[in-house]
Amino acid sequence: MECVGVQNVGAMAVLTRPRLNRWSGGELCQEKSIFLAYEQYESKCNSSSGSDSCVVDKEDFADEEDYIKAGGSQLVFVQMQQKKDMDQQSKLSDELRQISAGQTVLDLVVIGCGPAGLALAAESAKLGLNVGLVGPDLPFTNNYGVWEDEFKDLGLQACIEHVWRDTIVYLDDDEPILIGRAYGRVSRHFLHEELLKRCVEAGVLYLNSKVDRIVEATNGQSLVECEGDVVIPCRFVTVASGAASGKFLQYELGSPRVSVQTAYGVEVEVDNNPFDPSLMVFMDYRDYLRHDAQSLEAKYPTFLYAMPMSPTRVFFEETCLASKDAMPFDLLKKKLMLRLNTLGVRIKEIYEEEWSYIPVGGSLPNTEQKTLAFGAAASMVHPATGYSVVRSLSEAPKCASVLANILRQHYSKNMLTSSSIPSISTQAWNTLWPQERKRQRSFFLFGLALILQLDIEGIRSFFRAFFRVPKWMWQGFLGSSLSSADLMLFAFYMFIIAPNDMRKGLIRHLLSDPTGATLIRTYLTF
């Protein structure tokens, strides 16, 4: 699915070499790349120093949940993905004026330089706010897949590098399902340059530094303390540093533990591409395993996600939709190679490897805190699909407008005091997480908990019913456009269409799983 990077990443100890499997025959040359990539990465780590070091301190994480969000047992691969060389992308420090720490009080500091952070900083500065952006100067390294019409609506169609006229789903050996919606692959380079250009034009300031902590001053200001004893005073701070932001934010207690979507991908030149280049393969759940590999499928059901860039160049990705414990990347790679071998695909050249790690579900931020959040740090990742970039980019203007209005109304009248901050921050939080959004999220969390319990045949059965509901429903579900009332209607249709064993499972899940009680309680709250 969509790949979302984890921006605030650190390790709890010195990196250790992951266990990598090698296989005989033709699979050996395909497996070499992950080993060589790790060797090159480890060498870079050993030779680096200072803020760019690959060894980070345990204190970078607030708790075990934060560590899992950052990458947990797969952290080394998450860091390898982050450290990819993307020479085409401009450096933020070369294009944006530097923050002069201590010389002025900024209206807003945005922590984190991913798509969410850049978008919010640019939109806020466009409205006249004095905005500072703080975070390591890293490129966009993840591949993003989007529905073409959604990116067009954002005015970002020029950032799409390839479009497929339709998307296709395979569940078993029966007829495939055409979704009826064009899909695009986003150019990392074009998206980075476009968002950076917007920041430059709006006058966003920048500091290439990690943030140590955020301190609330007695005068109502926030102090952003960075490396090297640099302190930036500001009126508001928004954390957009990825899912693992517990060091700066408080999250609600009592929510289900965060789950993880992992995917291993390769862009390759191949012989015998089995897929139509005009169609993007959204999910391929067909059976491809031999008896000696069934245990892999039993523990971690996965599907193939494929983007044919040409008749011979394809991006293949083996994806575990969600798991309580992250499916290891070496197992994902093994399953991908087994699948490609079964399909008769022979890899001639590897252009790039990708390690996608997306925390899904978990807790919402505590909306009574002054420090704000945006993007994955604000739990804006869709719990059931792993998508978040379109939502972050589409909601950035609205969030920026709310912040600008708050500052105009209160600061211009010298009303922004420490005592008024909590109620003012609540206004911003309620824009990001109104009750309607919370209802939708409770529905998705209920669905996520159900998916976590299903084996491969259960997942196929679920999606057979899913794609039999009215088309506008499942298209809206995948595009995150259904209201909470629409989602209830969707659930009703699913229940009517589903086989008896799934109906029983749905009732049991609603009555016994904590997400069922949360769903009912959230829907009844107004």
From Swiss-Prot:
Which enzyme type, at the first EC level? Answer: isomerase
One annotated GO biological process: carotenoid biosynthetic process
Q: Where in the cell is it found?
A: Plastid, Chloroplast membrane
Write out the entry's keywords from A to Z: Carotenoid biosynthesis, Chloroplast, Isomerase, Membrane, NAD, Plastid, Transit peptide, Transmembrane, Transmembrane helix
Give the top-rank taxon of the lineage listed in the UniProt record for this protein. Eukaryota
The pathway is: Carotenoid biosynthesis; alpha-zeacarotene biosynthesis; Carotenoid biosynthesis; delta-carotene biosynthesis
Report if keyword Plastid is assigned. Answer: yes
Q: Which is an annotated GO molecular function term of this record? A: intramolecular oxidoreductase activity
Binding annotation for NAD(+): 108-136
A GO cellular component term found in this entry reads:
chloroplast membrane
Can you tell me where the transmembrane regions are?
A: 443-463, 477-497
Q: Which InterPro entries match?
A: FAD/NAD-bd_sf (IPR036188), Lycopene_cyclase_b/e (IPR010108)
Could you tell me the membrane topology recorded for this protein? Multi-pass membrane protein
Primary residence? plastid
- Write the Enzyme Commission number(s) for this entry: 5.5.1.18
Write out the catalysed reaction: a carotenoid psi-end group = a carotenoid epsilon-end group
Q: Report the protein's function.
A: Catalyzes the single cyclization reaction which converts lycopene to delta-carotene and neurosporene to alpha-zeacarotene. Required for lutein biosynthesis.
| PANTHER family in the record | LYCOPENE EPSILON CYCLASE, CHLOROPLASTIC (PTHR39757:SF3), PTHR39757
Q: Which family does it belong to?
A: Belongs to the lycopene cyclase family.
State what protein this is by name. Answer: Lycopene epsilon cyclase, chloroplastic
Supply the source organism for this entry.
Solanum lycopersicum
> Which gene is transcribed and translated to give this protein?
CRTL-E-1
